[in-house]
């Protein structure tokens, strides 16, 4: 039986070794995300993707929140003289805030904008830039190459939460 928490499996860097493919995944997320929620009703959007999991609405808003943070972390790593220590956040607590009950279109617009800018930034980066790092206080040093791979997976992971829920429910 598939684990609904990880519909595409847990993150494994070996599966995300192509920088070009990872960048394309970042570029493609806005369209893929829109397609994943297209035509869903409010009732469907308020359905958890698994027992005890976020609703589809919360998942869309989480993608916007998380990818804003990642884009900012890229910019910090590219512009600071030393590897910056980034500030983690409580994503589960963010998902409970009132703005996560708003229409998903608000976050789809954010994802459109962030991913357009992120794609432009990725296209401008050199090999050396991708080796720049930031420090996560809980998980240590991350190169931007590794973060790109993680967020390519993250994009596909949460899109799969949406699409697998639709498929399971015949929506």
Regions found by a protein language model. Give the residues of each.
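Short, contiguous alpha-helical
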Residues: 1-12, 46-92, 97, 116-119, ...
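Short low-complexity stretches enriched in small and charged residues
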Residues: 12-17, 24-31, 72-77, 113-115
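Active-site rim elements
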Residues: 16-20, 103-108, 145-148
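Short, contiguous, helix-prone interaction/anchoring segments in small proteins
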Residues: 17-50
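Acidic/histidine-rich alpha-helical segments that form the ligand environment
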Residues: 24-36, 93-131, 151
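A short secondary-structure junction motif
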Residues: 36, 40-43, 81, 125-128, ...
């Amino acid at each position: 039986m598939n684990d609904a928490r990880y519909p595409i499996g847990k993150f494994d860097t070996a599966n995300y070794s192509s920088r070009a493919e990872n960048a394309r995944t970042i570029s493609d997320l806005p369209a893929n995300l829109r397609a994943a929620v297209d035509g869903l009703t409010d009732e469907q959007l308020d359905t958890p993707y698994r027992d005890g999991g976020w609703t589809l609405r919360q998942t869309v808003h989480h993608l916007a929140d998380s990818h804003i943070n990642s884009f900012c972390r890229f910019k910090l790593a590219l512009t600071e003289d030393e590897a910056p220590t980034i500030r983690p956040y409580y994503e589960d607590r963010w998902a409970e805030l009132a703005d996560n009950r708003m229409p998903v279109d608000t976050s789809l617009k954010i994802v459109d904008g962030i991913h357009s800018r992120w794609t432009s930034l990725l296209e401008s980066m050199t090999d050396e830039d991708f080796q720049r790092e930031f420090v996560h206080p809980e998980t240590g040093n991350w190169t931007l190459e590794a973060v790109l791979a993680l967020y390519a997976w993250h994009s596909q992971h949460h899109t799969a939460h949406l699409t697998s829920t639709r498929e399971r429910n015949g929506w």
